[in-house]
């Protein structure tokens, strides 16, 4: 090697050595905490939803639709990446690796900006990102890793990589993608207008596209007691961060506006908006203030740490020593319900527990009327979030979803299950107890509404479709929610949505009718009518 080559090689080695010295601390902190998470294996509430979705992918593959929850709903809006990777290894392991990657990416970003001043913030972020695993927000962990990768690529001038990661981020976590869009707008306001807007448009645009193609909607609650502390922290951050830290100050402004938007306008984001501040504000405080205003940092740090730790403690307390987080708790009632619903298929209403593991363990051959996605539950089942729940209103809801059985656990309930439990305890005449053990009481609904009525009867409901037997020409109502992706794979029939969002089948010829939901691009903007053959589409 020549002298110039040796010099360049030595410089490269020195950079690698310096990078290794900087990264070992966040790598160690996040790695140890991730290992503790994997060993302790806490059954937090959000993990129940991830477990269900990974199980669906293992059995159904990449699906657009699921009938096991809510009478039918679209799947991809909640994230593609975790079900895919989690089915190959383990969802917990995938998220743990993502957290370590996030800690290393954050370190690279802030060391490049603040140098050694960032050390405390780097270690802080590694710890806070890792403890968020204990809340079960696994999709969010993947989304944060992709978002930080996009920010690092943007910082290093690799626009193509940044845009690619911004497009991937919503497939990991829509919430993290909207946070990335917020970061992109911050960069644009700071001066990197084109690069920042590219990131913002890519991430937010992909969220909008997924929402358009696989609509779900609904709103996440954002109560005043959650909004005020977050908004006050944003104001305090803006006041305390030195004026020369323009990028950081622009970011705090963007975050404050995001909080206002999420609080004043009903949206799926809702209270999830606080996650960005809880995860990043404290570590960024430390980076910006450590060598300039340590006293302010020492005053604010306890508040920021409490903001990060309190949700983790609350979630762990919910599942602590609860037998109802284990599959064995559900086995007797699942066996009973499988037996009775095999004879004639109905949905089962399972009162939602505080930790929501019923949504993972009950839908094993059983189609439940609700599930664990707060936004969708509020949209489809608003009666459980209103002040009073009357017996007539409840009976109407049971009939709308063709519920034949109601299962009541002895475990602590979610707040959206308490009014329902109180009503059932008042013994409405249409509910008859048919099974009871130490943990469960199952009620049969008197004269339940069938899943299919009219000109066809139900043969079988499947996770992504249903099979009917057409009895005569005419209309049948199927109490499975409508999707534009229905396809008539067998038989002669046309499908249209009902006014209340379910599926109406017009039987054109008696006999077997098989309907399946599969993604087809030309149906994205489709509307009302789906027929088995083109030449039947004009049939009245």
Where are these regions (language model features)?
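Start-transfer (signal-anchor) and selected internal transmembrane alpha helices
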Residues: 1-35, 539-540
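Membrane-interface junctions at the ends of membrane-embedded or membrane-associated helices
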Residues: 2-18, 69, 154-162, 188-197, ...
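Transmembrane signal-anchor helices characteristic of membrane glycosylation enzymes that use polyprenol
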Residues: 19-47, 207-210, 306-309
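Membrane-embedded helix bundles of polyisoprenyl
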Residues: 30, 100-109, 117-155, 159-188, ...
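Active-site lumenal/periplasmic loops and adjacent helix-entry segments of GT-C-fold
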Residues: 34-115, 119, 124, 128-139, ...
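Transmembrane catalytic cores of multi-pass membrane glycosyltransferases
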Residues: 41-49, 59-63, 143, 164-281, ...
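Signature aromatic-anchored transmembrane alpha helix within multi-pass, membrane-resident enzymes
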Residues: 292-311
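Extracytoplasmic
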Residues: 311-540
């Amino acid at each position: 090697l020549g002298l110039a080559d040796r010099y360049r090689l030595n410089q490269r080695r020195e950079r690698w050595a310096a990078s290794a010295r900087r990264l070992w601390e966040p790598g160690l902190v996040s790695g140890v905490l991730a290992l503790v998470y994997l060993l302790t294996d806490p059954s937090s509430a959000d993990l129940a939803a991830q477990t269900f979705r990974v199980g669906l992918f293992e059995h159904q593959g990449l699906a657009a639709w699921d009938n096991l929850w809510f009478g039918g709903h679209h799947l991809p809006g909640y994230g593609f990446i975790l079900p895919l990777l989690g089915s190959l290894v383990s969802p917990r392991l995938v998220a743990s690796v993502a957290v370590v990657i996030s800690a290393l990416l954050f370190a690279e970003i802030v060391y490049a900006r603040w140098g050694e001043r960032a050390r405390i913030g780097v270690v802080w972020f590694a710890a806070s990102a890792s403890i968020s695993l204990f809340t079960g927000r696994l999709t969010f962990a993947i989304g944060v890793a992709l978002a930080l990768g996009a920010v690092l690529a943007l910082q290093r001038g690799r626009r193509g990589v940044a845009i690619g990661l911004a497009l991937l981020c919503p497939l990991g976590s829509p919430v993290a993608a909207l946070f990335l869009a917020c970061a992109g707008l911050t960069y644009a306001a700071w001066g990197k207008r084109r690069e920042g807007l590219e990131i913002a448009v890519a991430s937010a645009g992909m969220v909008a596209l997924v929402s358009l193609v696989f609509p779900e909607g609904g709103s996440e609650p954002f109560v005043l007691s959650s909004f005020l502390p977050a908004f006050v922290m944003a104001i305090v951050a803006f006041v305390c961060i030195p004026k020369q830290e323009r990028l950081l100050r622009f970011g705090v402004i963007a975050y404050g506006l995001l909080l206002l938007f999420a609080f004043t306008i009903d949206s799926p984001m809702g209270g999830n908006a606080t996650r960005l501040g809880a995860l990043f504000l404290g570590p960024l405080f430390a980076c910006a203030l450590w060598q300039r205003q340590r006293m302010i940092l020492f005053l604010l740090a306890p508040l920021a740490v409490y903001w990060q730790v309190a949700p983790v403690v609350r979630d762990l307390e919910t599942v602590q020593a609860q037998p109802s987080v284990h599959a064995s708790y559900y086995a007797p009632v699942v066996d009973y319900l499988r037996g009775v619903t095999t004879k004639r298929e109905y949905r089962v209403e399972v009162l939602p527990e505080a930790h929501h593991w019923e949504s993972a363990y009950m839908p094993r051959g059983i189609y439940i009327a609700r599930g664990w996605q707060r936004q969708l539950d509020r949209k489809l089942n608003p009666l459980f979030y209103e002040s009073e729940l009357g017996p007539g209103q409840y009976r109407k809801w049971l009939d709308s979803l063709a519920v034949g059985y109601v299962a009541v656990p002895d475990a602590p309930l979610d707040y959206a299950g308490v009014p329902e439990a109180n009503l059932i305890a008042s013994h409405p005449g249409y509910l008859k107890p048919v099974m009871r053990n130490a943990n469960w009481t199952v009620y049969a609904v008197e004269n339940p509404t069938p899943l299919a009525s009219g000109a066809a009867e139900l043969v079988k409901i499947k996770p992504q479709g249903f099979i009917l037997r057409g009895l005569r020409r005419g209309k049948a109502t199927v109490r499975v929610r409508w999707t534009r992706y229905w396809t008539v794979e067998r038989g002669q029939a046309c499908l249209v949505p009902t006014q209340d969002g379910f599926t109406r089948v017009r039987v054109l010829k008696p006999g077997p009718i098989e309907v399946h939901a599969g993604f087809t691009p030309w149906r994205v903007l489709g509307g009302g009518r789906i027929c088995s053959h083109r030449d039947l589409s004009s049939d009245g």
